[in-house]
């Protein structure tokens, strides 16, 4: 049996050499700040690079916190260096596992994708319902995984390393999260 590393660095920027984990932490911290500035309580799965949490443990952390939304920021990589754009993954419905969070997760994914495309002008690569992701299948709370761009595309890699572009991503995700929370509150 083959298992995944508990914490992996993911892909790296083809031009910048920036590891995915470093990029996503920077965006995650900006997102935290944007949400906290609007009065939202945020629980982070990590605030530094020195973390050894599995995807199950990350989902359990969100569950234990009673999160209204679990946002798992990632960046994409591809063997095709022309691949570009953003897409958002969310859990498909699996009876007994994700059936109660699939619909709200899809709504949060729709909001996140629309906000990311509007804020950054990135190519809309759509939504992707998944049933093979541990971080989704162990989550008891709505969860989305925005892929914020392709680090294997020279142009997007440079953009993703730009602090002002990261601010746009963080603000877009904050706007989407707030709209999701408002919709859920009724």
Predicted regions and their residues:
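Envelope-exposed proteins and targeting segments
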Residues: 21, 38-41, 69, 84-86, ...
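Soluble non-cytosolic domains of exported or imported proteins
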Residues: 18-26, 52-56, 99-107, 160-171
